Amino acid sequence: MLRQIAIADAYGAGFEFSSQEKIDNHNDLTRYMAHDLTGSCGKYTDDTQMNIALAELIASGESWTPETVANHFVDTFNRDPRGGYSKRFRAVLDECSSGQDLLKSIKPESTRNGAAMRSPVIAYLGNEEAIRSHCELQASVTHNTPIATQSSQAVALAAYFGLSQTGTVAEIPSFLKSHGVNIWNYEWQGESTVQAYDACSAALTCLLNCRQLSSLIIECVALGGDTDTVAAIAVGIAACYTEYEKDIPEKLLDSLDEVTYGVAFLDDLNNQLHTSLTSNQAQD
């Protein structure tokens, strides 16, 4: 999951709120594009980094509390500061040395997509009740609003539905409905804003329409808007389904511009998640 999220994120970042002309001319998965504002190219953003933070929390076996969640957000950022965060949240993180600092500094009233984008990895908790409660807890740290919480739960549960081999992609809406988080527009069209409802609706629409990771990324980016987040969410979920062809071009994998926290690191962390999942399932 994590390497796919990173590639989708880094690829989508090159088209984030770009012109339709740029998307039409270059959205073909042949190479990463530079971000229009920062010039960054082939580097993943906050979408991947925050999945890493929660993945490391899961793998550590620590108890989830607002402070432990916040600690992992701060520690992961401080060891590897990078772009993609909103200006306001980035300014807060720049001043934090601990989770306690973050909790004191932030007003968690956002309805944006930050809680959703970091939720695919929560599927590795391997238990529907635990997934729902942990989504609510982690969302409360930065996005303590009903829509943000529901978006987090929808993303993690959709990923779990595939990871547990319980159902198919086409059955995701029914599965989410059974958990009371089926409020999304599955026929989304046009740009996705940074709002949780938009990003979740856009990602799920594209997810239901495709069965190949390559076509999924292209379709997410083709919508325009917050392309890196929509692609990262959709691909994070899709990676959990055997019916999805894992056909991301090797060229994108090889040219991901990450050294310390690149593909090898992500694969090792993903292996730790699988070990944690097996342990959680054995306990159930």
What is each residue range found by the language model?
Residues 1-284:
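Structured, active/binding-site neighborhoods that engage oxygen-rich ligands
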